[in-house]
Regions:
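N-terminal intrinsically disordered/low-complexity leader segments
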Residues: 1-19, 30
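Amphipathic, non-transmembrane alpha-helical scaffold segments
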Residues: 17, 21, 71, 75, ...
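Generic hydrophobic, amphipathic alpha-helix propensity
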Residues: 20-29, 45, 70-74, 78, ...
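Helix-turn-helix
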Residues: 23, 27-69
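Hydrophobic alpha-helical connector segments
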Residues: 69, 80-115, 168, 193
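Amphipathic alpha-helical packing segments from all-alpha helical-bundle domains
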Residues: 79-80, 112-122, 129-156, 166, ...
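Short alpha-helical scaffolding segments that buttress acidic/His motifs in well-ordered protein cores
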Residues: 107, 121, 125, 168-175
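Hydrophobic/aromatic-rich alpha-helical bundle segments in the mid-to-C-terminal region
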Residues: 135-139, 154-204
């Protein structure tokens, strides 16, 4: 069953209303990528989306609710795209090198080659440092993402799949963040893929 989408007054939205709300969230994400979370407000999103301040307030009510919606959108994208490769990850579990290669391919295709997604993901996580209202939704999605690959990590040989997933996740995140700031030529072949393979073998020692 699809989750019903509502506005700030808890009124269920029509399909058209839900689409308009999505457009406003996308506008907020563009601001986050371009200027950082601190630049997001009901007014700046209204300007970015060529909408009225009242319309943004109708859908979200507060900046906090708007930011939560932005986090939900980014994290949902990661869950959907990552979930699609879980069968490949589980199938590769008997071979750590192949397991690493699946993770590399996913991150290259969905994060490195889509820098706006990667930057938005990092920015909303950083926003959680200063904005406590975002922490519950970040925690919720973190558990969702970890649960998706728990079986694959166990099949790989991990004795503590949640901890090992977190270790690999944040290490990969750091590698990609470094590439975003200081791009390297042949990043995937000469740096990223070998590093991820070492990460995977390290959790099996």
């Amino acid at each position: 069953m699809n989750k019903k989408i509502k506005n700030a007054a808890n009124i269920e939205l029509t399909h058209r209303g839900a689409q308009r709300r999505d457009d406003l969230v996308k506008a907020a994400l563009r601001i986050i990528v371009r200027e950082g979370p601190g630049a997001v407000s009901l007014r700046t999103v209204a300007k970015e989306a060529a909408a009225s301040h009242g319309l943004v307030a109708y859908y979200f009510g507060t900046r906090s609710a708007l930011m939560v919606a932005a986090v939900e959108t980014v994290c949902s994208y990661i869950a959907t795209t990552f979930g699609a490769i879980i069968p490949d990850l589980e199938a590769a579990a008997p071979d750590p090198s192949k397991f690493a290669a699946v993770l590399v391919r996913y991150n290259i295709d969905h994060v490195v080659h889509h820098p706006d997604i990667g930057l938005a993901l990092y920015e909303v996580n950083l926003a959680g440092i200063r904005e406590p209202d975002l922490r519950p939704v970040l925690l919720k999605w973190g558990k969702v993402h970890a649960a998706l690959c728990r079986k694959a990590f166990i099949a790989l040989g991990s004795k503590e799949p949640e901890k090992d997933y977190a270790f690999v996740l944040y290490a990969i995140g750091g590698l990609i963040l470094g590439q975003s700031a200081l791009p390297r030529r042949k990043f995937e072949a000469e740096f990223f893929a070998p590093a991820v393979e070492r990460l995977i073998y390290s959790i099996l020692r």
